[in-house]
């Protein structure tokens, strides 16, 4: 029984890690979805700013009574852009937190594995059970998952 303890310790930390990874993946996906309309908004604002710069407001008779209209419009567009950028900055912070949360859980799994590696039976590590994949496969998956998040936002 004592020889099973190292394997059980690694399996337990794996069992705790995967639900966290799944929850963080959901947060990652929803955050990325939140970014799409913000990026569209920024793109539209950039087009509007460019179009407004190409118009000579003083040459349009209907706009002459509003001498500061071009500057007010520009200011409003820039303010709207700043708001969208602030929201995107918040989303980026969320993505970085997801990356860090996943990495810390993966690191914990590998620390536990390394802590018990000398006592682990290699056959047991490589052997899947009826209800779960092998520990080696799960460790490889976690490395791939961690690499994905780290390469997305280094």
Regions from the PLM with identified roles:
Residues 1-154:
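Long alpha-helical rod scaffolds of large eukaryotic non-enzymatic complex subunits
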């Amino acid at each position: 029984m004592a020889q099973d303890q190292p394997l059980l310790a690694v399996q337990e930390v794996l069992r705790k890690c995967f639900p966290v990874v799944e929850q963080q993946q959901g947060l990652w996906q929803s955050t990325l979805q939140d970014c799409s309309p913000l990026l569209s908004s920024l793109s539209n604002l950039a087009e509007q700013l460019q179009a407004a710069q190409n118009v000579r407001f003083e040459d349009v008779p209907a706009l002459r009574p509003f001498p500061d209209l071009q500057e007010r419009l520009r200011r409003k567009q820039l303010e709207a852009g700043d708001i969208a950028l602030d929201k995107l900055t918040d989303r980026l912070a969320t993505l970085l937190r997801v990356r860090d949360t996943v990495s810390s859980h993966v690191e914990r799994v590998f620390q536990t594995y390394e802590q018990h590696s000398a006592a682990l039976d290699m056959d047991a590590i490589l052997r899947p059970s009826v209800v779960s994949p092998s520990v080696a496969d799960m460790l490889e998956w976690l490395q791939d998952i961690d690499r994905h998040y780290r390469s997305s936002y280094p």
